Structure formats: C-alpha cells, structure tokens
Amino acid sequence: MYKIDLNCDLGEGFGVYKMGNDEEILKYITSANIACGFHAGDPKIMHETVRLSLLNDVAIGAHPGLPDLAGFGRRNINVSPDEIYDMVVYQIGALYAFVKSEGGVMHHVKPHGTLYNMAAKNKKLARAIAEGVYNVNPEFILFGLSGSELISEGNRIGLRTASEVFADRTYQLDGSLTPRSAGNAAIITDIDKAAERVYRMIKYGLVMCEQKKDIGIKADTLCIHGDNPHSLIFVRKINKHLKDLGVYIEKIIHE
C-alpha cells in the first residue's frame, strides 16, 4: 500500500490582500502550513485559516519564515542561529495560541521559503530550527526537504520528522530544489507529468533531477504551493491522479 500526506502553504495573504483559494484547497489536502506573520499572514488571517482547517479535519502546522513581508520570505537575509531560534519560537507560539483557542491540536512545523532552503544545507541553522520546535513541543512533527540537514537535525534531537517532496518543483543532483531564479526550469506546470513524478517518488524512492540522473528521495509528505492562480486546479488533479493510481492520501499520525 502506498500513501502520502498532501500539504499546502496557506494563510499567506496580508490585510486586504488575499493569496490563493484556501477554503477550496482545504477540501483536497491533509495538512496545512499556516503563515505566522513574518513573510505573510496576520492575526485575522491566521485565526480564520485555523478555523477552516479544523472544519475540514486538516492537520495544522506553523509555517515560520524570515521577517520579509515585501519579499514574501524569499529573499536572502543574513541571520544568526540565535536569531533563527527566536523567530521560529515566536511564530510557532503565535499560531499555537490560535489553535488552542479554537480547541484544536497543532501537528507540525514547516519553515517557509528562504528559511526552508537555508536550513536544508546549513547545519547550524537547521539545528536552531529543530531546537526551537523541540523546546516548544517535542511532539510536533518537523517537515523538511527530503535528505536535508533539517531532517537530520530533527532526527538528532528526537523530533519525529516528515521528509517532504514537491510536485511542482524540479531537483538538482544534490537533492536540492532548483532555485526559483532559474525561471521555468524550476517549476513544473504539467499536472500529469507532476503526478507521474510523485508516484515514482512514492513507489520507487527516485526522482529524475535536472542533470538527467535518478536520485534517491524519501516521500512522507507532498507539497502543493497555494500561492498561484492555478493552485486549486493543481491540487485537485494531483489528489485525483494519485488516488487513481492507488495511493492513499492521509495525514501523518503522531506515533
């Protein structure tokens, strides 16, 4: 039996600005990563996204990012491990309070954007994130790029981790994601192609990188980005395609 968690980054609007169609996307995913105010999101949006996630029985996770509203958390900022630790704890705490106020349970933490990419390769930053998560609640599951330093540091400290793969992104030979600065080479828009790649990741633990070689990959959770106009169509079709191939879509259960 093949199974996968389907996660999406949500609550990424700000004030009067709306990003994506969260209410509809929640019908097709099993885990939501909710922005916590640094790269996107605000108290009202956080509260509403938590409420909608609970209504749809979707696992709730904090999605902490760098303090970069103008750049959507995707610009490089020089920060120390101590600063990263504080930012992560602060943002987790903010979302944790909303989840608790609605009678829910927080499930996981997944860093956003540049913070996620830095933690994939930088052991010290990865350790700061893992320690921040563990010290808030050691029961939280840490989502990170498959094969990354973040997964290694999460495992080292004693967190349960979930290795994440991407349906709409391409990979490099070292297992990292192709930078968005590469333009079209970084993004997969063909839904059938994306679904076939994901199925291969789940079944065989392999993905073809941009250098035309197979690399090993572990797929516990699949990310669908929610910040573009076609996200709803993409997630709906990926969900159906995987189910048609016999893959169970289900949230990761705490052990």
UniProtKB/Swiss-Prot annotation:
The entry's keywords: ATP-binding, Hydrolase, Nucleotide-binding
GO molecular function: 5-oxoprolinase (ATP-hydrolyzing) activity; ATP binding
Entry keyword annotation includes Nucleotide-binding: yes
EC number: 3.5.2.9
Keyword ATP-binding among UniProt keywords: yes
GO biological process: carbohydrate metabolic process
Pfam families documented for this protein: LamB_YcsF (PF03746)
Top-level enzyme category: hydrolase
Catalytic activity entry: 5-oxo-L-proline + ATP + 2 H2O = L-glutamate + ADP + phosphate + H(+)
Subunit structure: Forms a complex composed of PxpA, PxpB and PxpC.
NCBIfam families linked: PRK05406.1-3, PRK05406.1-5
Family: Belongs to the LamB/PxpA family.
PANTHER family tied to this protein: 5-OXOPROLINASE SUBUNIT A (PTHR30292:SF0), UNCHARACTERIZED PROTEIN YBGL-RELATED (PTHR30292)
Job description of the protein: Catalyzes the cleavage of 5-oxoproline to form L-glutamate coupled to the hydrolysis of ATP to ADP and inorganic phosphate.
Protein name: 5-oxoprolinase subunit A
